[in-house]
């Protein structure tokens, strides 16, 4: 009996230990399923007060006009490149005056300027004014010919002054751009030009000219060079491409006009995860099953998300994820609150815990657009019944995010599919004061809300995303390289459901797409080791400044 009593006491004493083990296991399971509660890393004062922000237009109006821009509105190409230079010079904080040779035949008093940018390929409208320009450069001025020049009488008068030893009457195809390492960030390698055409003048440079960029291949085609002339210099761009995707090349070329060129840049890199957190994405999971033999839900939890976090750890990336509450297509303003929240808690809290940020994407994936927007067969979306319906949807999204992440500061809105109508934009400014940033698209596209890096009149920061997906094709690489040199910025987004869509690389498989992302991030941070990793709101704070 005595022995039995001792045994019973021992069993009783062991119960608290066993209970403690079970409680620890339960706590660990809860933490795992909820993503572990986040610790806020974000500085709550990343934004400037709206009244303290000096907008780009205001700053431009105050600039001393030190640059003369010469163009010809009768020439479509001249108009195209002038459109780009308007933004380039604004962002570089260079004050300028424009002369349109369709309206005048005189350059005016050149001594009033420090630099001149000639946006003309045909110099005949300038006539003898080109000789006055040459004399001004010889006396210490700096002039840039930004367009591929035509072989004509007045150009021939300038050839030697521009550092051209000989020139043909033909043009050569430019299928890549190779900047020297000292000329541009990310230099020392080829950047493929998609859809190349004969855009460069077939010329040979003199030994005096200093070459900064060329097209490598069978022939080394000079694309950017400078040539000293007297006390001044000429800079020539022989690229023949005048689109937004190559602004960084022109800004770098403009910087050659002075011995030291300084202008404010953003200095920031932001990676976005669109549709994240969200319900389990719909779509075709055949490539996931092909490669891993598991369903979509398990793939995202056990493979995709750990890999995304591993890349963040490797490169110091702090993702900004933007929430989709549901994938329904209802647009009548009747709201159904999301009841299944475990994925939002798990992935969202994990994202925050790793120094990331949560933003807004949509109550559903229907862009904020009314019936006056006609998608046709281009986009598979519905339009909203009225403004009240859109407002109901946004109110629900904001409330849902507050419930999911009550301690997080959320201010960034990403339009579904980068589509945002004028009415939707007005709604955000008028009814959603929480939203301080709209992050959409840098380039034009079907129904795309195209942006510049700027602060809008209503104080909302416009923050375009430059490239997307994990495919990272040649065009995206060129765009990323260009903007790294224009604004010292990177903005990239991908969707959590890219692996369910062949158009976004699903057939390549996640291993290949992951390698592409790894390679891109490696290039980015090797090329620009001083580039700051920021969240979406932090990048907006940098844009404000």
Segments and roles (model prediction):
Residues 65-73, 138-139, 145-157, 313-423, ...:
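Metal-dependent polysaccharide deacetylase catalytic core of the NodB/CE4 family, i.e.
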Residues 2-22:
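N-terminal Sec-pathway targeting helices
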Residues 252-270, 307-320, 403-405, 432-453, ...:
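C-terminal domain-boundary segment and adjacent tail
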Residues 74-152, 302:
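Helical hinge/lid and interdomain linker segments adjacent to catalytic or ligand-binding clefts
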Residues 124-190:
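A glycine-rich, often tryptophan-bearing local segment used as a flexible ligand/cofactor-contacting loop or short
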Residues 242-252, 256-350, 354:
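Active-site beta->alpha N-cap acidic-glycine motif
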Residues 63-67, 142, 198-268:
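A glycine-centered loop/beta-turn motif at secondary-structure junctions
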Residues 20-26, 386-457:
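Catalytic domains of cell-wall/extracellular-matrix polysaccharide-remodeling enzymes
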């Amino acid at each position: 009996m005595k022995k039995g009593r001792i045994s019973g006491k021992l069993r009783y004493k062991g119960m608290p230990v066993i209970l403690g083990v079970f409680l620890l296991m339960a706590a660990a399971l809860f933490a795992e399923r909820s993503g572990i509660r986040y610790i806020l890393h974000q500085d709550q004062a990343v934004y400037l007060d709206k009244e303290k922000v000096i907008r780009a237009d205001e700053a431009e109006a105050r600039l001393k006009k030190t640059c003369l821009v010469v163009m010809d509105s009768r020439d479509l190409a001249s108009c195209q490149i002038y459109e780009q230079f308007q933004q380039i010079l604004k962002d570089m904080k260079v004050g300028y005056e424009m002369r349109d040779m369709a309206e005048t035949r005189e350059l005016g008093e050149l001594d009033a300027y420090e630099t001149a940018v000639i946006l003309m390929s045909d110099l005949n409208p300038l006539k003898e004014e080109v000789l006055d320009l040459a004399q001004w450069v010889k006396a210490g001025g700096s002039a840039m010919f930004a367009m591929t020049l035509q072989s004509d009488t007045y150009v021939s008068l300038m050839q030697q002054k521009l550092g051209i030893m000989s020139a043909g009457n033909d043009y050569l195809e430019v299928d890549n751009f190779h900047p020297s390492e000292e000329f541009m960030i990310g230099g020392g390698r080829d950047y493929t030009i998609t859809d190349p055409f004969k855009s460069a003048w077939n010329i040979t440079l003199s030994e005096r000219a200093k070459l900064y960029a060329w097209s490598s291949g069978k022939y080394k085609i000079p694309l950017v060079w400078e040539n000293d002339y007297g006390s001044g210099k000429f800079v020539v761009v022989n690229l023949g491409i005048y689109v937004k995707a190559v602004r960084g090349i022109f800004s770098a070329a403009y910087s050659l006009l002075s011995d030291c060129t300084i202008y404010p840049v953003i200095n920031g890199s932001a990676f976005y995860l669109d549709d994240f957190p969200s319900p389990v994405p719909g779509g075709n999971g055949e490539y996931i099953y092909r490669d891993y033999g598991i369903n979509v839900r398990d793939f995202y939890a056990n493979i995709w998300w750990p890999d995304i976090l591993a890349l963040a750890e490797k490169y110091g990336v702090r993702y900004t994820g933007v929430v989709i509450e549901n994938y329904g297509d209802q647009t009548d303003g009747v709201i159904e609150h999301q009841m299944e929240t475990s994925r939002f808690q798990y992935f969202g809290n994990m994202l925050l815990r790793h120094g990331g940020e949560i933003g807004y994407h949509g109550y559903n994936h229907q862009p904020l657009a009314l019936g006056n927007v006609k998608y046709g067969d281009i986009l598979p979306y519905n339009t909203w019944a009225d403004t009240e319906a859109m407002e109901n949807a946004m109110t629900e999204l904001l409330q849902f995010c507050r419930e999911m992440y009550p301690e997080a500061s959320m201010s960034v809105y990403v339009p579904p599919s980068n589509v945002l109508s004028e009415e939707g934009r007005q709604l955000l400014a008028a009814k959603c004061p929480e939203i301080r940033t709209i992050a959409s698209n840098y380039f034009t596209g079907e129904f795309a809300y195209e942006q510049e890096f700027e602060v809008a009149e209503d104080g909302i920061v416009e923050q375009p995303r430059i490239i997307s997906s994990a495919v990272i094709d040649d065009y995206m690489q060129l765009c990323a390289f260009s903007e790294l040199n224009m604004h010292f910025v990177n903005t990239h987004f991908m969707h959590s459901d890219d692996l369910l869509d062949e158009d976004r690389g699903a057939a390549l498989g996640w291993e290949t797409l992951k390698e592409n992302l790894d390679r891109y991030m490696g290039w980015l941070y090797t090329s620009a080791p001083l580039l700051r990793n920021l969240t979406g709101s932090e990048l907006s704070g940098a844009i404000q400044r």
